[in-house]
Amino acid sequence: WDSNFANPDVRAAFTNHTLRIVREFHPRYLGLASEINTYMDTYPKDAQNFISLYHEVYAKIKAEAPDTQVFVTFQWEDLNNLFIGDPSGGTPYQIKWELVEVFEPNLDLWVISSYPFAAFDSASEIPADYYTPLLTRTDKLLAVAEGGFTSREDGPFHGNEQDQVDYLNAIHT
């Protein structure tokens, strides 16, 4: 059993499950992967297999449900090379746009997750223009699928309730 996205059984299962969701639930929005860039960083040899599967499944979804908005999500701190020990070894704030753009033109909207407590000790350290590159890179709709700032110390992460407020202000600016 080879569990990567090159495996025809994995591809068929992914496709069939996705189309069943489309047929039974008629979703307005459908995310086909969460924080896919972290998978691509960790399993670079399998990334192209997932990308090709995404494009194949996207076409099948659109053939049956053209109004369904299809996307994958991207982990913003990872995309910005802000994780300590990131296997991609990139320069901080040098955004890995190529990981997003390989899904184009088949991203109906750009969707991120953002947990800046993994990169900043306090939400007050989040740069004022932290999310601005998204606005200047695409004219598609943007969404935040998940995110937050920790409310207490937890291992290497710092935070408090004010950090949660500051995070919400940063993401809405």
Task: List the predicted regions and their residue ranges.
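Active-site-adjacent "subsite" loops/lids of carbohydrate-active enzymes
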Residues: 1-20
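Surface-exposed cleft-lining segments at the edges of enzyme active sites
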Residues: 3-6, 36-47, 112-124, 155-159
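Alpha-helical scaffolding within the catalytic cores
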Residues: 14-21, 76-101, 124-133, 169-171
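Active-site groove signature of glycoside hydrolases
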Residues: 16-47, 71-73
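A structural motif corresponding to the C-terminal end of an alpha-helix
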Residues: 20-28, 56-70, 103-106, 134-140, ...
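Aromatic-lined carbohydrate-recognition surfaces of secreted/lumenal glycan-active proteins
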Residues: 31-34, 53-93, 140-152
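Glycoside hydrolase catalytic-domain groove-lining segments
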Residues: 66-69, 94-156
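Substrate-binding clefts and catalytic carboxylate motifs of secreted carbohydrate-active enzymes
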Residues: 151-173
